[in-house]
């Protein structure tokens, strides 16, 4: 996916309200982001229509539905250290498991911040555990926390976590 402020929001909007079961996104350079997304479809035909629709919007789509390696391993490996990324802030956030929660979050951000990383997977509980990165200064952390508070999405800043420093 092309990496620019608002591209994540635009992609989620292109899904037209479909249920997202998993979303792994990582900035991987000035103009590129790696995305691994699980979207609920009702049939093989529905999946093919979605792929054609997204391809028509210039998204590069690779259907990994039948890949056991992707389902068992690759989904957890999207990302790594982002080259040339400065001022990244990491948040661990609880999203309510309800339709539109992600889109509401992106809409409230209003294109003010470049999202550099996003990891979510539906585990069937009342809240989804999300890890999200923003390209922003330390001082902008308070604004992001305020936005999350307004949405009632509890969060914890993880920028100084050893796991983040070592792997991401």
Regions found by a protein language model. Name each.
Residues 1-168:
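A conserved regulatory-domain signal marking ACT and ACT-like small-molecule sensing domains
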């Amino acid at each position: 996916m092309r990496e620019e402020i608002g591209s994540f929001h635009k992609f989620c909007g292109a899904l037209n309200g479909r249920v997202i079961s998993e979303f792994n996104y990582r900035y991987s350079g000035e103009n590129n982001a790696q995305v691994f997304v699980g979207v609920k479809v009702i049939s093989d035909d529905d999946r093919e229509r979605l792929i054609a629709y997204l391809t028509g919007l210039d998204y590069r789509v690779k259907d990994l539905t039948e890949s056991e390696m992707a389902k068992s391993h690759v989904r957890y490996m999207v990302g790594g250290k982002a080259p040339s990324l400065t001022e990244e802030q990491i948040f661990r956030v609880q999203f309510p498991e309800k339709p539109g929660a992600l889109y509401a979050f992106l809409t409230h951000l209003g294109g003010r911040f470049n999202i550099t990383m996003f990891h979510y997977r539906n585990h069937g509980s009342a809240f989804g555990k999300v890890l999200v990165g923003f390209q922003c200064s330390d001082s902008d952390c308070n604004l992001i926390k305020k936005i999350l508070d307004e949405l009632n999405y509890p969060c914890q800043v993880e920028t100084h976590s050893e796991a983040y420093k070592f792997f991401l």
